[in-house]
C-alpha cells in the first residue's frame, strides 16, 4: 500500500517520459483505485503496460471488497500478479486459491505473473530447492501447455526483500534455472525456454545489471526501487543494455 493518487500518476508520468524502452516491456502495478488514472498517463508511451496487484479467485457474486478478473478486463487491464509473497504470508493464499486465480486470469484474458520464492528459514536449512520446486509443481503443473505459455513467472527470495540481505547474481541464476528445470519435468523444454522468469529480490540500480546479465533472468519484479524515479529509470536502462 504505497502512494496516493497524485504520487502514482506523477511516478508513472516521470518514468514513462524518462526512458523509451525498445527491448523491454515496463509494466506498472498501481493500487486498484489508481489503475485507470495510471493507464491514461501511459496511454501514448511505447512499451509501457499496466496490471493489477491482485484479483479474486471467484468469478463474481457476494464477495464484498473483492475485485474480479472480469472487472479488471472491463477497464483494459492486461496483467495481474498472482501469489505475491505478501499475499501468501499475510492473507494465507495457498496453492488451491492461487490455481483458482490463475484460472480466472486465463478465462478473462489476463496475463498472470505467478510469484514463487522461499523464506529465510527454508534458505537457511538448505530446503529452498525443494520448497520452490513444490510451489511450481503444486500449481503450475495443473495448467495446460497453452496456459503456461501465457504465464510469466517471478522468483521472489523472500529472505532478500527488505531485510538488508541480498541474493547474489549466482543465487538468482541458480533458482531461475531450477524453475526452468522443474517445469521441464512436465512441459516441452522448448516452450519452457521461451517463458520469462523475472527476479524479485530487492532489485535496485546497483545490482540490476549483474542480476539481469544472468542467463535465466529475463527481467525484474521491482518493489521499493520502483517508487524512486531515478532508481527505476536506471533499472530499466540496465535491462535495456542486456543483449
PLM feature spans:
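Conserved N-terminal beta1-alpha1 strand-loop-helix module at the mouth
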Residues: 1-67, 149, 154
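Structural detector of well-ordered beta-strand residues that form the stable sheet scaffold
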Residues: 27-29, 51, 81, 113-115, ...
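Expand to "…catalyze enediolate/carbanion chemistry for C-C bond making/breaking, isomerization
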Residues: 73-77, 85-243
